[in-house]
């Protein structure tokens, strides 16, 4: 396929997902951890009706069969409840890499790796993801992304695993972080920092409270147009974050990049 076209992006994204899935499977067989692609663990071959482990699925099937990317109700890998079958699907070129620690029931395991520390590590190697959540690092495949480029990402993930497992000193692998607070990070290794962050995530239950915050949508008190008119009329004022309760935001907030 012509890699100047959208089909090329899809092919490369599928190849990268398969590579990470196969690497995860190999490490799992050795009882070792690795990252995993965020997608279904199995897909169905429409010709045979058989279920195939994702890491064994033909690339051509994944690149041409939309059913491979549908979020079906009741599947633990995506965690969404109450969705109708066939209502939504993954965009294969939005490649989410899941860090160890989030269990299929949505609970945090005793140990895990915060995605932020992975992003910081990748950033030092010049790899900048499109988005980072508590447990996932997201990359967008676009025109120009080739095996050479995503291969660099895979090598960086392998490097991270090596440095994490050996608890490499922060001064070596995250020197800017270590230099920003030398007393705080003195003598700490990469795994030390990850374990401390993970313990805080479990204790604070930040994922739970974030989910609660978005579980109930607010009641609109004013249209965006009216709020903007108030802003233009000089009727808006700056307030600190702790003073925003029961106030109407006069300036719109636009999520970017779109679709994420």
PLM regions and their residue ranges:
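Non-catalytic terminal extensions of PLP-dependent enzymes
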Residues: 3-260
């Amino acid at each position: 396929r012509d890699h100047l076209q959208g089909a090329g992006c899809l092919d490369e994204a599928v190849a990268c997902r398969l590579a990470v899935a196969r690497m995860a499977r190999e490490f799992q067989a050795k009882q070792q951890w690795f990252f995993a692609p965020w997608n279904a663990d199995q897909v169905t071959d429409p010709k045979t009706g058989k279920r195939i482990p994702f890491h064994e699925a033909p690339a051509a099937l994944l690149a041409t069969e939309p059913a491979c990317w549908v979020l079906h109700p009741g599947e633990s890998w995506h965690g969404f409840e109450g969705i109708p079958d066939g209502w939504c699907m993954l965009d294969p070129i939005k490649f989410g890499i899941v860090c160890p620690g989030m269990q299929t029931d949505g609970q945090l395991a005793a140990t895990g790796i915060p995605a932020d520390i992975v992003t910081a590590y990748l950033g030092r190697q010049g790899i900048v993801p499109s988005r980072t959540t508590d447990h996932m690092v997201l990359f967008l495949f676009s025109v120009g992304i080739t095996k050479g480029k995503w291969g660099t990402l895979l090598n960086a993930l392998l490097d991270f695993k090596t440095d994490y497992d050996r608890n490499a000193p922060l001064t070596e692998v995250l020197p800017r972080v270590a230099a920003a607070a030398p007393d705080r990070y003195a003598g700490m290794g990469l795994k030390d920092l990850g374990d401390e962050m993970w313990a805080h995530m479990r204790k604070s239950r930040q994922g739970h409270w974030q989910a609660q915050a978005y579980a109930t949508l607010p009641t609109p008190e004013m249209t965006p147009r009216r709020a903007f008119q108030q802003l233009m009329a000089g009727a808006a004022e700056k307030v600190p974050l702790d003073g925003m309760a029961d106030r109407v935001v006069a300036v719109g907030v636009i999520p970017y990049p779109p679709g994420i």
